[in-house]
Structure formats: C-alpha cells, structure tokens
Amino acid sequence: MQSKKKWGLAITLAMVMLVSTACNSTNGGASSNEATSTSGNGSTPASAKTITLGFSQVGAESGWRSANTKSIQDSAKEAGYDLKFSDAQQKQENQIKALRSFIQQKVTVIAFSPVVESGWDTVLKEAKDAGIPVILTDRAVDSPDKTLYKTFIGSDFVEEGRKAGQWLNDKYKDTQEEVNIVELQGTTGSAPANDRQEGFMELIASNSKLKVIASQSGDFTRAKGKEVMQAFLKAHKKIDVLYAHNDDMALGAIQAIEAAGLKPGVDITIISVDAVKDGMQAAADGKINFIVECNPLLGPQLMEAVQSVVDGKDIEPRIVTDETTFTSEQAKEALPTREY
C-alpha cells in the first residue's frame, strides 16, 4: 500500500510539473512575440489587432465610381481589414451621418470621398478629438486646417483639365473661326468639377478662338448628361466641341447627339475624363476624340496609407495617382487589356 501511495504521489508531481512547464512555455512565446510588436507600455498596438476601416463613398453614380468601390472593397479584404462601408448617395448629410457613426463605433481609421469640398470642418474635428485619423480619397476638402486629415490620395483634377485644354489648343491652334464649346460639369461644388473646369479654362484662355458658350452640371450621371446635352442642342445652333467632366456624362450626351441626327466625334468633337471601359469603347469607336484618364483603382494605395497611419509612420500629405491620356487610336489599342 505504501508503495502504491509513493507511485501515485510521483505521478501527480510529474503531471503538475508538465502543466507548469507547458504554461510557462506558452507565456514565454507570447512575451517573445510582444517584444517585436508591442509598444513600450506592453499594450498591443493597433497594427497587431484587426484594423477597422470606416469608408464613406460618394455614391454609385458612374462606372468610375463602381470600379473605385470594388477596388477599395477588394483591397480591404486582401489586407485583412474589417471594412465598414457606407454609400452617401451623393448627399453630404448622409456622409456626415456616416462619419459620425464611424466615430461612435470607434473605428481605427476613417476614409471618405467627399461629395462636395466645403462644410466638413465640424465633423472632421469630432474625429480628431476622438483620436481617429482621417484619409481623403479621390476628392479633397476645402479647409484651412490641414491637421484634420492625414493625407489626400487621388488625381490632380486641375491637371486633368489642363490636359483636356492642351489637346483642344493643339487641335485648333491654326483655326481662323470661332470654336463653340459646351461644358458638362460634374456635381456642383465638388472638387473634380471645380478643378477640371479651372484647368481647362486656364489652358484654352491662350486661344481667343475657343469660346465656352454654355456650361451646366450633369451631376456625373449618364441620364443627366443626356438631358443637359439635349438642352444645349436646342439652345445653340452651332456646337463644335463638348467637354464632359466624366465618361458617363459624355456617353449620355452621345445619345442626345445621335438622336439629333449628328455624328459624335465628327460633327461635334468630344473630350471626356475618366477612361472607364464604356468611355474607352466609345473612343475606340470614334465617338469620343480624347479621354483624360482618372484612375479609380485607389484601393491598394489607401490600404497602404491606412497601415502607415496605424503604425505611426510619416506619410505624404498628398499622394497623386499616375495617369495618362488616350486618343481614339490609343484607346483602341489599350481597350483589350483595360482593367476598368
């Protein structure tokens, strides 16, 4: 009996030592990992946790916007981020409501593409006070306080307008007749609408023969582009050029031009911005003469910026995307391998 008791005690002690060793080994492993990924106070940094990204999109008004949304959703999934997505349906009040919801949910980072440029200071200050960094994508905000956001990722819209104006200048540099231009603007008050107009007007100002005879918002939609172009055609007997701030408005305008018995790209020269697939197809078909690219695939750059902000790294206040331009012939060549 004494022998059995000794064996029982020995087995019990062995088991206790084994469990103790296993627990110490587990804790030791965690401590080792924390040494390379935690801050000095021993807490786990945000980069080691699941990053929650609150993103408020303008809407789904165009093919460009759809491609932009998909790029962000796919990139967030690939990065392993928890994406909270909100569609503002092109209304600033919806977007402000979404940003405040993100603040209440205590997301890690907020990113959004502003519907319009102004009116953001109050909600951005709320995010700053809550310690939530903000990243702007595609569109900028008009605010004197640049500390309200970490960076702005997107195109140089003024430069896009300049490219459109430069091409038109070159096309009509030797003309002796007045060239009547109509302009389909984007959403009133939005950064791309303001800037694309500014850059375009800056470049054509050097040619006194180039005259903008009408300019109206088509709200970046195909339906509105068609509607406004119909009004232009009724109001003006001679239209030589259409400058559209995006492909969808240009495509709507093409429908109106064809319905009026005219040939788009021949009777009326058409310049557009975006270079999405439908626009590129129209260019390849000769219906759009010149397209300035605006790259919607901002997802990878956004996720990289989010990670840098979370890790406390320095980040450029302005990140400009690389873009090009397409004539009809160049669009025809590029179309088969076009990603969007």
What residue spans do the PLM features occupy?
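Methionine-biased hydrophobic packing positions in alpha-helices, especially
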Residues: 15-17, 249
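Sec-dependent N-terminal signal peptides
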Residues: 6-15
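A residue-level marker of the well-folded mature domains of exported/periplasmic proteins
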Residues: 2-6, 23-340
